[in-house]
Amino acid sequence: MKYTMQLISRDELKRKLERKDQFKLVMALGDWQYRAKHIPGSLHFPTLEDARAELAQDDEIVVYCSNSACPASVLAYEYLVRHGYTHVRRYAGGILDWEEAGYPLEGEMVAAKTP
């Protein structure tokens, strides 16, 4: 299957979250990584099959992982597209890019802000 991977920028993703747009933000890493640190509002599924069971094919979906070199979001993107999902985009920068911009994260490894 030939396709062009659809990407979303950090700033566009931030705007979508701020506007509370209707879309599914999916972290494509393991459970321990999700528990440690993720973008607020993210969903996590133990397997890609679980994601397919929970996501509608016409949902707008953004997948991400840890950074631009991480293959997990590429694999999740390709899997969803191959299974008929039509509105999938990849946030290539991932958690590292989000955190470097100073945007909020949630999870057990996120430092608490001091007043």
Language model features: what each stretch is:
Residues L17, H38, G102:
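Short, flexible helix/strand-to-coil boundary loops that buttress conserved ligand/catalytic motifs
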Residues I8, H44-P46:
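Short acidic-hydrophobic, aromatic-tinged amphipathic segments that line or gate anion-handling sites
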Residues Y34-P40, R52-A56, W98:
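Short loop/helix-cap segments at secondary-structure boundaries that form the rim of catalytic
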Residues K16-L17, E49-D58:
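Short amphipathic alpha-helix with an adjacent loop that forms part of the alpha/beta core around
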